[in-house]
């Protein structure tokens, strides 16, 4: 539309009979709106990590317990630690922020993550800082292993499934055998209690000859 008006405006002085047109080639820009500036990112250029290690286990019921240990130049304000885990389906980053141990040390830091339920098919747990300087230095991962006692009386079927996922088949079959024996003994105990409280009394009342001393 602006191009058509420009052609008419240039042609009007030549034609002589064309009425004058008020031409506006460009619209006025909207007024600037002042916005609050974003808070500056922490200066982590002097932050250095010389050693980083993570250990993680899965307690009964798929509860993750992880420890992240760092050593280095930690005298500057620490960036926010982040955790996410990887499953067969992909990544998930909705994990609570690890809790830092209360310590005055400027050389070593430890972060804990306790009692967070993760899927049974979790492959890796990954730790990093956000934001960070030289992120590859801080990136560390660990493979969670299911922690099952030698007498797995309180282990669940989910724990046995996790053992199979970790390819620890011998431990999984052992735990399954112990759980089967446990459930069998529990059923025997229930049957004995039911027999003593109800069945035996009913037989005494209706068939007393079965308990006669003359036999």
Curated annotation (Swiss-Prot):
GO biological process, one term: symbiont-mediated suppression of host antigen processing and presentation of peptide antigen via MHC class I
Domain (Ig-like H-type) ranges: 47-146
Spans within the Lumenal topological domain: 18-182
Pfam family, any one: CMV_US
Glycosylation sites: 73
Leader sequence segment: 1-17
TM segment ranges: 183-203
S-S bridge residues: 56-142
Gene Ontology CC: host cell endoplasmic reticulum membrane; membrane
Localization: Host endoplasmic reticulum membrane
Name of the protein this chain belongs to: Membrane glycoprotein US11
Species for this entry: Human cytomegalovirus (strain Merlin)
């Amino acid at each position: 539309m602006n191009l058509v008006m420009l052609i008419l405006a240039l042609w009007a002085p030549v034609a002589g009979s064309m009425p004058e047109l008020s031409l506006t080639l460009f619209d006025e820009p909207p007024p600037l709106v002042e916005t609050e500036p974003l808070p500056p990112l922490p200066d982590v250029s002097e932050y250095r990590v010389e050693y980083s290690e993570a250990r993680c286990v899965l307690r009964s019921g798929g509860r993750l317990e992880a420890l992240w240990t760092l050593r280095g130049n930690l005298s500057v304000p620490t960036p926010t630690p982040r955790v996410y885990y990887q499953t067969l389906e992909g990544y998930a980053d909705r994990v609570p922020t690890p809790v830092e141990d209360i310590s005055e040390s400027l050389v070593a830091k430890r972060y804990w993550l306790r009692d967070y339920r993760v899927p049974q098919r979790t492959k890796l747990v990954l730790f990093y800082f956000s934001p960070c300087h030289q992120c590859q230095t801080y990136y560390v991962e660990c493979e969670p292993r299911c922690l099952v006692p030698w007498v797995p009386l309180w282990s669940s079927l989910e724990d046995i499934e996790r053992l199979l996922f970790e390819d620890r088949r011998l431990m999984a079959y052992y735990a399954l055998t112990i759980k089967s024996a446990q459930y069998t003994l529990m059923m025997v105990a229930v049957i004995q209690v039911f027999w003593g409280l109800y069945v035996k009394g009913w037989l005494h009342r209706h068939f007393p000859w079965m308990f006669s001393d003359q036999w």
